[in-house]
Structure formats: C-alpha cells, structure tokens
Swiss-Prot record:
Function of the molecule: Catalyzes the decarboxylation of orotidine 5'-monophosphate (OMP) to uridine 5'-monophosphate (UMP).
CDD domains named among the record's database cross-references: OMP_decarboxylase_like
GO molecular function: orotidine-5'-phosphate decarboxylase activity
This protein's name: Orotidine 5'-phosphate decarboxylase
Any Gene Ontology biological process: 'de novo' UMP biosynthetic process
Gene Ontology cellular-component annotations: cytosol
UniProt pathway annotation: Pyrimidine metabolism; UMP biosynthesis via de novo pathway; UMP from orotate: step 2/2
Subunit field text: Homodimer.
Species the sequence originates in: Bacillus cereus (strain Q1)
Alphabetized HAMAP family for the sequence: OMPdecase_type1_B (MF_01200_B)
Any single Pfam family the record assigns to this protein: OMPdecase
Length: 238
C-alpha cells in the first residue's frame, strides 16, 4: 500500500529535491511534481526522478480548450509519468480529449497514465464556492456532480478531500479512484488547506491514494515522518 502514498515534492528546484531524496536512498517512492517544480525544471526533472526509480504524479491541473489539452496530454504521456490530472470544470469534451491525447502519446508497450480530475481544491470552503465561484450547490453535491461527469468522460477518478470519498463511492462505485490531498499528521498545522484529515482517517473513509507534503518534506527527519505516515495509512500498529 506504500505505492498509494504519494509524497508531494513541493520544492522550488532540483537542488532541493536532491537534498530531500538523500533521506530515501533505496526507497522507491510515488512522488508528486507540481507546477512550481515542473515550470522551473521542465521535463528534465521527470527524467531525473524516473532514473531514480520513482513513480510520478504530474500535477499540472490542465484546464483549456479540448484540442489544447489533447496536445498537452500527448506530450505528457511521452514523459512516461504514472498519473496526470485536469480540472473537471473543463467539461466532458475536454476530459475526453485528455484521454485521447494520453492514448496517442503513451510509450510503446505501456499503459497510459492514470488520469484524474480535480473536483474542488482542498483550499475551497463551501462559503467560498458559493460566494466567489458562484456554485449554489453544497460542496458535497458539487463534488459528486463533477465526479459523475469525470466517470462519464472516461477518466479513472478524481482528486477530492477525504470527506467526500464515501459519497463518491456511492455515486461512482468502488473501482473509481479517489486521490486525497490535505493529509496531515495530528500534530501538524493545517496551513492553507481547509478540508484536511489524518492518514488513518483517510484509510477509514476509503481513499485510494493519499498525497502528503509538508508533514514529510518539512519534518526534522523526513524518512521517519514518511514511515509514520505509511504506518498510519496501512493500519500498522507499532
């Protein structure tokens, strides 16, 4: 189950990544590369991480017209990443185009990357969604609507908070992938995320993958923090 624990490499550049990964010699991680790191280092950071044996969730949250997203996904698939994402708000045609691009760009003999859609960011509260984004549904209703649209479009799952996982299991079935950021150890600050949970709670609620950043990357001993998160996520008593 450790391969369903994704470590967010929220660093400004490769040097910081190299320093962090020194704590994990011999470990094969599933890591998340976001906008900050990818926009600074480009595809070279993907090559570097792949050479180290790590799986990669390339978290760029694409949201554009269908043809642009299709072309972008064709390029991303050629990098041999393991997971990519789009914004569900881009709609059915855009999400279908994303899958078409991934199929066209995947490396020969390999499966296309897992493709998931962002429903609502974990920094979004219901009040913000209604007042600023203009969606009058409850947060749970909005997330469920986007999840159904995502499944109908042929994607593998969604990014959502742990709080929405049980509802999405009802709406989309057990095979639908739920990737949940906003994971913190009980002793950590929540920082800028609103809908957060512990690894243990994420497991209880049925998350497929959890994404953990600062609880590991900012820890005094990142490897020990990783092991603690992993134990809680896997339900191991020590």
């Amino acid at each position: 189950m450790s391969q369903s624990l994704i470590v967010a490499l929220d660093f400004p550049g490769k040097q910081d990544v190299e320093q962090f990964l020194r704590h994990f010699e011999g470990e094969e991680l599933f890591v998340k590369v976001g906008m900050e790191l990818f926009y600074k280092e480009g595809p070279a950071i993907i090559t570097y991480l792949k050479e180290k044996g790590h799986k990669i969730f390339l978290d760029l949250k694409l949201h554009d017209i269908p043809n642009t997203v299709k072309s972008a996904m064709r390029s991303l698939a050629s990098l041999d990443v393991d997971m990519v994402n789009v914004h569900a708000a881009g709609g059915n045609s855009m999400m279908k185009a994303a899958i078409e691009g991934l199929e066209e760009g995947k490396q020969e003999g390999k499966e296309r990357p897992i493709c998931i859609a962002v429903t609502q960011l974990t920094s979004t509260s219901e009040a913000m969604m209604k007042k600023e984004i203009g969606i009058e549904k409850t947060l749970e209703e909005a997330v469920a609507h986007y999840a159904k649209l995502t499944k109908e479009s042929g994607l593998d799952g969604v990014v959502c908070s742990t709080l929405e996982v049980p509802k999405l299991r009802e709406v989309c079935g057990d095979g639908f992938v739920t990737v949940t950021p906003g994971i913190r150890l009980a002793s950590d600050d929540v920082n800028d995320q609103v809908r957060v949970a512990t690894p243990k709670r994420a497991r209880e609620l049925g998350s497929s993958y959890i994404v953990v950043g600062r609880s590991i990357t900012k820890a005094e001993n990142p490897l020990e923090a990783y092991k603690t998160v992993k134990q809680q996520w896997e339900g191991v008593t020590v």
